[in-house]
Amino acid sequence: MSDREAAARRFVADVWNAGREESAYELVAAGCPGLGGTGPEAVLAWHRERRAAFPDLRYKLVDVVAAADRVAVRWRAAGTQAGPFGPVPPTGRVASFSGATFLRFDPAGRIVDVWHATELFQLLQQLGVEMLPPLTGP
């Protein structure tokens, strides 16, 4: 296992699942974009929002692929919605969904870019959000 792959696995285990915010300060570079800014604090803001909505949210790694300065992580997640998730009020429902996260590392082994693709439609359906077709006409 490469150092970058190990760092990606640690990022998911420590920051996402265990909520060990100090690990984000070790793993994430100052210039890494996040929610409303850059650096570990901005990356943590995104995870804090998820944990506030789904306090028991846990991610399970399905695939991890490392090449050069990048690591791709395919995952499944599940949790109970106990807080607001965007405009969706707490439902108390358990939702499971999947996604992929792509990480880019600098030469020192710190994360400099994070990109997520999440099955948001899948998640919102499980929370009872009604999906309507787009409006047509004027």
What does each model-found stretch correspond to?
Residues 1-138:
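C-terminal and inter-domain tail/linker signature
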